[in-house]
């Protein structure tokens, strides 16, 4: 029953670009079968087919597809997009990532398997619902970013390093950034973030993207890790609390609780970081701001600053309100 209610809410609120009662528009692609190879760390469904399998039979980014079969309780309409966040927080999509060979069915910033369904071994059918039906949104939700320091205004901007600030919170207590720990998780920026952690006098570094095993492997290899992070590790002040972005699933919520308790067992200043320092770090920053007694304006300013630091997205940008409503406002509504 909870999943049925969730699907109804998801369709009504989060995916207004598709109406499952309408007749399919502009069908040119053929149906494709795919098996769920695994449910990944994020709770999303990893398929056994590549994006080229769809391109070759008429599908393209910006199409709306229907996924059906397996253990899914009903056919689901969603965008086919290579930019997962273009569907907004808790939006459904058929997507792919540059470092992965096959397609994924997922929820942006949430766990598809927990929220919607699906399991390993499911045989699913992919069919075309509307050719180009998501294209306008897809184009508006594109984000610019590079790995070149020279493309950014400052080292701080490039590292996405800045304080978490609001009413009720002393300045200089909590900072956030992209990953300062490992080159493998933040290739171009980790040394910048590590240097700013040192300059800010950070005592406790809380990573919500790395495991201690990954950290130890890099240290044993002798390269690819933050020097200041290593100093904090030797003092017992480099804390590993990796969790996925759906912090409202019981298992993940428990991990967040353990992270917050570990945080207050150490002295400030604190640095909270995930890979980009944007999504998971943004959620934790909102929680801390709310606990301190923040305002909406402070939440928006702090959360959207990461989008400026990474993507030069600012209030005057044409697509700013799209990201504000589809990402931040949905996140706050869910919280």
Which role fits each region the language model picked out?
Residues 272-274:
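The Walker A (P-loop) glycine that initiates the GxxxxGKT/S ATP-binding motif of P-loop NTPases
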Residues 23-109, 113-129:
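Long, compositionally biased stretches
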Residues 276, 280-281:
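Ser/Thr-glycine-rich phosphate-binding loops at phosphate-binding pockets of nucleotides
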Residues 19-21, 109, 117-270, 283-335:
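Cys-dependent protein tyrosine phosphatase-like superfamily
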